[in-house]
Amino acid sequence: DELITSKDFRSVTFDSLMPKIFARYPIEFVSAKSVDRRFFQNLHSQFETLKRILSTDFSALGIDRRKAMVEPSFICEALGLQGRLDFLQVENGLCGIELKAGRPPYPENDLSKVSFPHRAQCALYQSMIQSVLGVKLENQHFYLLYSRNLNPEGCLRPVKTSTRELQKLLNLRNKIVSVERDISRYG
């Protein structure tokens, strides 16, 4: 969040950020079993990846972090969906980014590959934005950001959603809700 919201993200350092992260998530750090040197090396690597993306990839794609919201929440009663998107820029063309702390699907150098659950999540966000903000799918630019990708050019991957894909996802969601309702009713 601080890289996006600071006046100058270049001045934010990993060392200055760590005490703030510890203060915000003390229970998570104390209870985690795998917080060791390697954990912090991975965290530092992801931090540097995010800084690089902000300085190079964002400007190349016309994304302006200063015109963005961090973690806006959406509730869409019409679709029965809710969620919190990691990054949303509304001005100068709508752009949404969902951050994933893991690696993209194999092979990592195939920049068209995104995980199906991650793609579905972005598609549902796009559907909510269309419903809530009135921005048509074709006017939305969505990306998955895999911060542990080994290929620097492949961290930010576009996700385009079609109306047909959204219909399939919503139908699947409706079937799940129907089964859950039946289980709660009939056991």
In which residue ranges do the predicted regions lie?
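Metal-dependent nuclease catalytic cores that hydrolyze phosphodiester bonds in DNA/RNA
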Residues: D1-V90
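Mg2+/Mn2+-dependent nuclease catalytic core
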Residues: I63-S178
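Helicase P-loop NTPase motor core of nucleic-acid translocases
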Residues: S184-G187
